[in-house]
Amino acid sequence: MHAHASRPQARQTTLLRRAALFDFPASADLSPGTEAARHHTIQWLSRFGVFEGHESVAEYDALRFDVLAGLFYPRATGADLNLGSDLVGWYFVFDDQFDGELGSRPEAVARLVADVIRITEEDTAHGRAQDGEGPLLESFRDLWRRISSGRPQVWRDRFRHHWLEYLHSYHREALERTGALPGAGGDAPRSVEAVLALRRHSIGVQPCLDLNEPFGGYTLPPALHGGFPMARMREATDDVVVFTNDIASLDKELAVGDVHNSVIVQWERAGGELEDAVRHIADLANARYRWFEETAARLPALLTEAGADPGTHHAVGRYVDGMRHVMTGNLGWSVRTARYDERGTEAVSGGRQRPWAQLTGAEELIRAGRGAPLPPLGSGSGSR
């Protein structure tokens, strides 16, 4: 009894010890609207049938995705924070669909991705659910409508581009799991850089960053958003979140055999102790974060040299804060969520999946995928 009770404490101690390797803070700057967003998102997902009962709701609630949203958007409240919380919640529900057989069936994954993309192509004012779509797609249609409605076209195009990169990464991960890509499944150890190129998309950070613009009441010009140094700062934000997530989720992913983890890849390549690989990845995260802060300190002068007006200075400052909130907020959530502690590991061990992990009609998708032509992989795979 005593030994069993100590296991969660030991797992939490390991997580906190690893988190202490990061030189940047774990944010506790939580939006005052977080508790309201917590209840809103559970009700929203429940309305579409994502949860089968009270136990499923309780398991989801223990993961506190609302806290992640509240740390990402500490100045947002009301409808804005509710939308951010719904996006984060949907992300993780969607991600959990791939923990079983579906994640190793590229044809089925491609069809699911195509179904989600189809919704992004609909007229947001007149899009209608199709028969048999199910909770995942029906909830996404509602989410997409609320994200897109009333936004500037330049922002909508930006968000959709990032969203498609995120979606296509699931297909590429499935191809890698089955050795269907050149170099995948071979004898040569994978590289951290190659895994990172894919994880920058699958981590889903860029759409979360995009929401900072409508929440803050501004839209960055494409040349500024996509130019130096902002594009590189966004990539550094991706990398810090990826490395943080890979360290926080390491025990869970070792338990389920997930290979898309930079720590595991570093361990495969370098050998030695697992904790040596953890320290190496933490060092990479720290270097990215230091570069980010050094560049952020130079930004006002760079903008002045470029002739930026006060409004642009203010918008860029808000966006830089948004990137910082995502990096530090992700770490703050990672050390307090049940997703990465003993409960989180046991919840996906031994073939078990989350109660909401069967929303895709995976068996039908898998059957439909056999022998049928695939939709195109799209431009989202690989590095930007």
From Swiss-Prot:
Gene3D superfamilies: Farnesyl Diphosphate Synthase
GO molecular function: metal ion binding; terpene synthase activity
Keyword terms: Lyase, Magnesium, Metal-binding
Note accompanying the cofactor annotation: Binds 3 Mg(2+) ions per subunit.
UniProt catalytic activity: (2E,6E)-farnesyl diphosphate + H2O = (+)-isoafricanol + diphosphate
UniProt binding sites for Mg(2+) 2: D95
EC number, UniProt record: 4.2.3.157
Disulfide bonds: none
Superkingdom in the source lineage: Bacteria
Cofactor(s) the record lists: Mg(2+)
Residues at which Mg(2+) 1 binds: D95
Enzyme class: lyase
Function statement: Catalyzes the cyclization of farnesyl diphosphate (FPP) to isoafricanol.
Record family assignment: Belongs to the terpene synthase family.
Name of the protein described by the UniProt record: Isoafricanol synthase
